[in-house]
């Protein structure tokens, strides 16, 4: 990841998280600048944590920020700094991807032994929460669903429930794990679906979803909006 892109990610992340509640620091925030400083630090820290940057030296981080704010002359030029950071984050991403892949494999192996959990093709697992009796969608259908998605640690990264309305999408334009599992779901069903990383977002991840993350979705299939049969 290029350093300039990293900065953009942190700023955009801060804007996206800005409406969420933040637990107040124990340090007194007496002025507007105090509050803005704390919020900026919190939101950027949140963005860095989502990217797996949890082993940073906080003293060095603050020292670097102070040096920049005070416009101190540096012995290392900016280009060399960016090259160093690009290499560092590339290695960090590789390590994080390997750890996530191993964690996902271990979770799925244990999950497959649980009562009520079945396995589809390509290692996709599911558990029926509510059995529907409607038709099953085809790959070319448009479906209407309610859903929420979480990481293995319980972090929720998406939810139609929180948006207040169901989602509609062509079944052949989503991640493979969704396409393959929803094709087996009768309308009216609610399933919990466990999707291996290679059937989700793979080594690239996306947003709060890290590289090689195994994902858990609770999906309620409400209806087939545009059945393929109606197009013939």
List the model feature ranges, each with a label.
Residues 13:
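Glycine-rich, flexible loop motifs
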Residues 10:
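Oxyanion-binding "anion nests"
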Residues 2-6, 19-232:
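Cross-family detector of peptidyl-prolyl cis-trans isomerase
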């Amino acid at each position: 990841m290029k350093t300039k892109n990293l900065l953009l990610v942190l700023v955009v992340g801060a804007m996206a998280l800005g409406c969420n509640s933040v637990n107040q620091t124990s340090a007194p925030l007496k002025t507007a600048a105090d509050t803005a400083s704390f919020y900026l630090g919190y939101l950027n820290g949140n963005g860095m944590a989502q990217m797996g940057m949890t082993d940073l030296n906080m003293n060095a981080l603050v020292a670097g920020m102070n040096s920049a704010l005070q416009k101190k002359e540096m012995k290392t030029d900016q280009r060399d700094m960016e090259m160093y950071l690009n290499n560092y984050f590339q290695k960090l991403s590789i390590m994080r991807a390997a750890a996530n892949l191993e964690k996902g494999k271990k979770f799925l192996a244990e999950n497959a032994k649980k009562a009520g959990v079945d396995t589809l093709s390509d290692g996709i697992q599911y558990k029926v929460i509510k059995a529907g009796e409607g038709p099953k969608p085809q790959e070319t259908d448009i479906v209407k669903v309610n859903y929420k998605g979480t990481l293995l640690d319980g972090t929720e990264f998406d939810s139609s429930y929180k948006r207040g309305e169901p989602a509609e999408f062509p079944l052949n334009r989503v991640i493979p794990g969704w396409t393959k599992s929803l094709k087996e779901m009768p309308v009216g069903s609610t399933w919990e679906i466990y999707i291996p990383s290679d059937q989700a977002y793979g080594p690239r991840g996306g947003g709060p979803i890290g590289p090689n993350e195994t994902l858990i979705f609770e999906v309620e299939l409400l209806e087939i909006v545009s059945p393929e049969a109606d197009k013939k």
